[in-house]
Amino acid sequence: MAKKRDKRLSNINEIKTQIINVKTELKNGVFIFSSPMTIGEFAQKINISGTEIVKEYFLKGKMYTLNHILSEEEIADLCFKHGYDFRVEKEINASNFLDNIEFEDKKEDLETRPPIITIMGHVDHGKTTLIDKIRKSNIVSTESSGITQHTGAYQIIYDNKKITFLDTPGHEAFSAMRARGSKVTDIVILVVAADDGVKPQTKEAIAHAQAANVPIIVFVNKMDKPSKDLNRLKNDLSVSGINLEEWGGDTPIVYGSALKGEGIEKLFENINLQAEILDLKFNPKRHPLGVVIESKMDKGVGSLTTVIVQNGTLHKGDFLVAGPRYGRVKAIYDTNKKPLKKVGAGTPVFVIGLNYAPSAGEKFVGINDEKYAKKLSQEREDSEKQEKFLQQTQTISIRRDNDKKIFNIIIKSDTQGTAEAIKDLILQIANDEIEVIVVSYGIGVINNSDLLLAQTSNSEIIGFNSKPNPNIKQQAEDLNIQINSFDVVYKIVDYLNEKINKMVKPKFEKRTIGRAKILKVFFYSKVGNIAGCLMEEGHVKSDSFVKVYRKNKLIHDGRVETLRKGPDEVKKIEKGFEFGLRIKNFDDIKEDDQLEIIEEFRI
């Protein structure tokens, strides 16, 4: 039987016609470029010595090397200095075409697609309870089919209309993942507890939605709580930039109780109404374009990727380019584990067969030509390698300049999205003396490759829901490679903060803690002069530092050797008491000398 002809509109022609390659060159006195470059590369293009440029920066007090990456402003300054004009041209290539190419569809080919909803809110405001109530199932359960759900992507039907929900993690540690969620989202449901009001994560969710220009529906949860304060809540929402319909704005507000199932239908009604206003369309007659929601390596099926098609139709057997690689879709399942032959826009599905785990938030494109899919993915891989090389080169240059201590980390997690979120979180843990470098991050169990990389890069391995087997653990111990596994993200943060603090050279400052006056000097042949003193202010300890002043002039800066009260050695003397004091290696004390008592404090 002849293979059925694929009548879907190909994406290839629009990609080929809109790709713009910019040649970096000096042409007719104008330096044309599209992206940052190193001093060495710039010097080569304008035919001068790179060392000359390095010297120019040195005279300005900047210690650059030939591998320093020049910013657009620095390139412009160098062009003017050497007598050239410049022009920055936007390049559309394999690495960025999905963000820049426009795919045009005929109006008569368009159909309505389901709205994609992201539920956001502060921790403990009832977001998970609302999700559970909407799904009418326990979100944390693991299905028995061999495919475990980690996506929080699901679809319901209300009033004969499909609604797709994305659940983004509720902790601010996952800001990056939540921001990605906003990019594929049509409507945000903002869950706010009636008895707690607007909190930091509420404001963060509002900021993400507004930055992505996504409309918001507010769901006021826990209306059954007697301590609710709706006036304060609405005022706080207004201050945070939410213009409620009740106050003449355009943001709907729904009141309810997720626990009791109250307000859910009203919420669905508002979603469908908002979706009608948005007039969400897609062309089912073209090859797919969409976004990766999550990906992981599943023991039973290999690579398991959750995607949402944003335009076109995804078919079993399609070639997808996502990130620097491509793969063929061997199977498609909906979120109820039902196998599908194809899926349109707005419906979350599991895809099997990509043989790799693309990053969460990565855009994908369906290509009906394997050779071209391979070409695109290879070009993207080459571009990413070049970008990574430039970043590493710049990092090495910065390290030389700032002379910081380096703490290298390798991250292994159960999902790609979580690994990236942890990476972003870890990179925020730094100070003036320690630079944290994430050498590598990925998914799966901790293995031999991780040990090899850790050994060559002097890295520590951090696992999240990822542990080494006993053999790998023993090898790590033999190689003196540290592995720490966690199941709570913020335990990683606490651990790393503690470790970094131990790496920092402690800093101290001296503070005055007391003042005393020498009343009389006693001489003992075995020890030398002992000062008989009165503690006038504060206190003195047996290990305190002491400054000796005579007629307001500092004559000695030393340390207490012995501290006595009567015949007994003591550790501390308080204000108002007389005491005996021996200053280490100093005998030139006299009556009426003033003592300033100093203590070192760690800062």
UniProtKB/Swiss-Prot annotation:
Annotated GO MF terms: GTP binding; GTPase activity; translation initiation factor activity
Q: Which InterPro entries match?
A: EF-G-like_DII, IF2_II, IF2_N, P-loop_NTPase, Small_GTP-bd, T_Tr_GTP-bd_dom, TF_IF2_bacterial-like, TIF_IF2
Q: Which Pfam families match?
A: EF-G_D2 (PF22042), GTP_EFTU (PF00009), IF-2 (PF11987), IF2_N (PF04760)
Q: Name the segments for region: G2.
A: 146-150
Family that this chain belongs to: Belongs to the TRAFAC class translation factor GTPase superfamily. Classic translation factor GTPase family. IF-2 subfamily.
List the record's Gene Ontology CC terms alphabetically. cytosol
Which segments constitute the tr-type G domain?
Answer: 112-279
Q: What does this protein do?
A: One of the essential components for the initiation of protein synthesis. Protects formylmethionyl-tRNA from spontaneous hydrolysis and promotes its binding to the 30S ribosomal subunits. Also involved in the hydrolysis of GTP during the formation of the 70S ribosomal complex.
Q: Where is this region: G4?
A: 221-224
- Origin superkingdom: Bacteria
UniProt region (G5), positions on chain: 257-259
Give the subcellular location. Answer: Cytoplasm
Annotated source species = Mycoplasmopsis pulmonis (strain UAB CTIP) (Mycoplasma pulmonis)
Write out the entry's keywords from A to Z.
Answer: Cytoplasm, GTP-binding, Initiation factor, Nucleotide-binding, Protein biosynthesis
Residues at which GTP binds: 121-128, 167-171, 221-224
Region spans: G1: 121-128
What is the designated name of this protein? Translation initiation factor IF-2
Q: What's the main place this protein lives?
A: cytoplasm
Q: Can the keyword Oxidoreductase be found in this entry's annotation?
A: no
What residue spans carry the region label G3?
167-170
